């Protein structure tokens, strides 16, 4: 359909941003931020206690998931010109429904829809939409509503959708009734250009954007946190500044998620994973995330992606130690090398992104896989193979006392190329 998944003139690019909790990744200063032309990097994270206790912090990310890996059954195209520049409630619900179903499949509990969180999400999406519709914005903190130098007319309080400098401020300003609990904000910003003026529906984009959020470990942590139980989202579309409305469209998927500081009793003493045995259609590769999950390894995820990470958590444990990890491609009978992120091997130790001692990530290292199926990358590494089963097994030492073993198989969806 003339739509490509590359950061180039013909593209579909996605910018994912996650901020954990009422303590957002935004500065509280009212001074204008610099629009410096650099690519977005890590957000500054607040160490403050969001209303009651320190909340989970999550990152800013530049992952660009492919629509080719969408879990939606409906992939027919529609004219871009017919997509109105507005909020699309059915699309946002479709995206969050995907996340809720993924959680339920793994025994993590579903999400109930919250109108207050929806309002927060839609309003912030509209704030960003107003910026990108009316100016060239090269770099900014997507959680922040601070004024930007040179863009004062479309940012800060001059933006008609201004609702607070950071996520915590917006929760307080909205008198969100559950703001004393944990809360988080995740943002996926996608721009699509199609030479023939056709693209996927907002619903399909939202579902794929949700799937992309689940493929990035520092976003995944918040979205599959069993403590979270309420959500609201907005999927706002717009015509990018100075672009042709017949061939270009922007999509902003903003999600707010909240819950209790206490893990449900029926989950707290269980070893949980994502993906899990019931997971299908997961993304094959991770091409970018900030903070970088492979920091310090000299790996450029954009050219050398890794496979879909596996998250492990045991809420009731003080510590876990994961060992004897194996990931096997069932069809091809090959063993996938792995790296770990845990309390002993954490590239962001000492920062707000540090994993707690009762969580870990398995990172599949897919350098030897020729998983790309089409295009210029055909025969190269695109993470795990598409539409394939992967068996995961590991030992887990709990509180340095009890050793248990886990084994399950998950299935990937179509190959994603960025």
Enumerate the language-model features and the residues they cover.
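Functional surface patches built around histidine and acidic residues
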Residues: 23-32, 36-42, 47-316, 320-329, ...
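Acidic, low-complexity Ser/Thr/Gly/Pro-rich repeat segments typical of extracellular/periplasmic
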Residues: 300-418
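Generic N-terminal leader/targeting and pre-domain segments
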Residues: 5, 20-23
């Amino acid at each position: 359909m003339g739509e490509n998944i590359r950061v180039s003139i013909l593209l579909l690019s996605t910018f994912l941003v996650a901020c954990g909790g009422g303590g957002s990744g935004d500065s509280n200063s009212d001074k204008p931020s610099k629009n410096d032309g650099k690519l977005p990097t890590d957000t500054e994270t607040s160490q403050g206690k969001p209303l009651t206790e320190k909340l989970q912090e999550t990152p800013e990310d530049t992952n660009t998931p492919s629509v080719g890996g969408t879990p939606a059954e409906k992939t027919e195209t529609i004219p871009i010109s017919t997509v109105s520049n507005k909020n699309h409630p059915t699309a946002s619900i479709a995206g969050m429904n995907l996340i809720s179903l993924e959680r339920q499949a793994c025994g993590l509990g579903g999400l109930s829809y919250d109108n207050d969180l929806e309002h927060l999400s839609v309003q912030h999406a509209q704030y960003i939409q107003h910026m990108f519709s009316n100016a060239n914005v090269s770099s900014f903190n997507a959680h922040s509503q601070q004024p930007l130098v040179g863009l004062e007319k479309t940012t800060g309080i001059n933006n008609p959708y201004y609702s607070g400098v950071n996520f915590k401020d917006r929760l307080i300003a909205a008198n969100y009734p559950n703001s004393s609990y944990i809360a988080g904000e995740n943002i996926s910003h996608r721009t699509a250009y199609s030479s023939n003026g056709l693209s996927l529906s907002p619903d399909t984009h939202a579902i794929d954007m949700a799937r992309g959020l689940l493929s990035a470990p520092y976003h995944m942590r918040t979205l599959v946190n069993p403590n979270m139980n309420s959500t609201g989202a907005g999927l706002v579309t717009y015509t990018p500044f100075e672009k042709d409305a017949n061939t270009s469209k922007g999509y902003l998927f903003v999600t707010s998620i909240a819950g209790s500081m206490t893990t449900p009793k029926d989950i707290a003493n269980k070893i949980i994973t994502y993906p899990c045995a019931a997971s299908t259609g997961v993304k094959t590769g991770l091409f970018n995330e900030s903070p970088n999950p492979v920091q310090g390894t000299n790996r450029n995820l954009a050219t050398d992606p890794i496979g879909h990470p596996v998250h492990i958590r045991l809420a009731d444990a003080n510590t876990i130690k994961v060992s004897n990890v194996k990931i096997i491609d069932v069809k091809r009978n090959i063993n996938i090398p792995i790296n770990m992120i845990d309390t002993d091997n954490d590239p962001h130790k000492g920062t707000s992104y540090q994993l707690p001692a009762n969580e870990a990530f398995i990172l599949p290292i897919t350098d030897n896989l020729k998983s790309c199926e089409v295009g210029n990358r055909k025969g190269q590494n695109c993470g795990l193979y598409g539409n394939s089963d992967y068996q995961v097994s590991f030992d887990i030492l709990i509180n340095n006392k009890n050793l248990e073993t886990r084994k399950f198989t998950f299935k990937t969806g179509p190959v994603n190329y960025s």
